[in-house]
UniProtKB/Swiss-Prot annotation:
InterPro entries linked to this entry: A-D-PHexomutase_a/b/a-I, A-D-PHexomutase_a/b/a-I/II/III, A-D-PHexomutase_a/b/a-II, A-D-PHexomutase_a/b/a-III, A-D-PHexomutase_C, A-D-PHexomutase_C_sf, A-D-PHexomutase_CS, Alpha-D-phosphohexomutase_SF
EC class of the enzyme, as a word: isomerase
Positions of modified residues (Phosphoserine): S102
Protein name in the entry: Phosphoglucosamine mutase 1
Catalytic center residues: S102 (phosphoserine intermediate)
GO molecular function, one term: phosphomannomutase activity
Binding site residues for Mg(2+): S102, D241, D243, D245
Domain of life the protein comes from: Bacteria
Amino acid sequence: MKQRKFFGTDGIRGRVGAGKMTPELALKLGWAAGRVLSRNGTQKVIIGKDTRISGYLFESALEAGLSAAGLNVLLLGPMPTPAVAYLTRTFRAEAGVVISASHNPYYDNGIKFFSTDGSKLDDAIELEIEAELEKPLVCVESHLLGKARRIEDAAGRYIEYCKGNFPADQTLEGLKIVVDCAHGATYHIAPNVFRELGADVIAIGDKPDGLNINDKVGATSMAKICETVLAEKADLGIALDGDGDRIMMVNRHGEVVDGDQILYILAVDAQKRGILKGGVVGTLMSNLGLDLALQALDIPFVRSKVGDRYVMEMLRENEWRIGGENSGHILNLDHGTTGDGIVAGILVLAAMRRQNASLEQLTEPMKMLPQVLVNVRFEGDSNPLDTDAVKSAQADVELQLGARGRVLLRKSGTEPLIRVMVEGDDHPQVLAHANRIADAVKAAC
């Protein structure tokens, strides 16, 4: 397949005002996408964004480009990524566009597309859009220009959809839940969803100012929610990331429940109910403890490359329904077409109610092996993973760990980082091994 020039593993992403993330490119991208998408269907596209201050800039540029190509635009304003996927389906739009850099800091932003069925855009269509980007922008005739309007009830529609994933004969009454919205796109949605299902909700990270998204809050910064769960004597906590497609949880003891443990809960619940279709897809980063726990229940488990795109591909290939990443991207294809943090939280709460169990009781059978992840920043085109020193350090650590451990080195698909992951039985040993390999990577950068 032809190499993509603009689109990465999750759309286009980068520092605002530099590289690809400029208003000029956003305008041209809107036009190019419009040219490709206008060949069929409804001639309308949905745009949603997270709470970054630069979202206004890119929303306007994309709107102008799409209109110049003759497509009508439906503007959602701040809206979680999975909400854009859902509303793209329900409005029967040609595509959905999300302006977000997910868990990245406010000074980054990104643009990604959903197809008309709410799934990520096919590689072939992205390549068609890239081909159009190489052409000069030519506006359609004035009478063919697209129009734009805001969808005022978008949040309400999505809230009702989320609630519909919880059993109609159950409520969350009696549960105290801390909900961390990461000052992101779920700030006006997630607390309301859980309140309307009956929970006593304490919301944090729910006051976005355009600059504070993911800043010491949310699914990538768990200290605040762990402290709040303990201080408020809450039953559990739910932490979402800036665009709402990731979830991490916290039990009543202030202990983090990650994506691997959430996958375990959902798989076991589905097995108990006789609705588990096949097995579970994790990634190369999934904890070995998940693999072993599912093996004990005769639930098949396979690993994809890192990235929810690859988890989805493997789910479709195997015709399975449940998969995800330890970082909190959870896919349940019986409940949506993309990772949805709010819905994943609802499904865990439903399992708690059905089994009359606490969050810690549901995760107790799964024994997590100590896992250490060290990120090493690098610049330039060279690949430090190809050096003899790094390969030697990795081989030596793997020899010492044996069958009860793993080493994984990989480049991030969204940031200039080398990720060093080491897993084994003994945490101090695992930490020492990870730092040793990370030092070798740093020296090679």
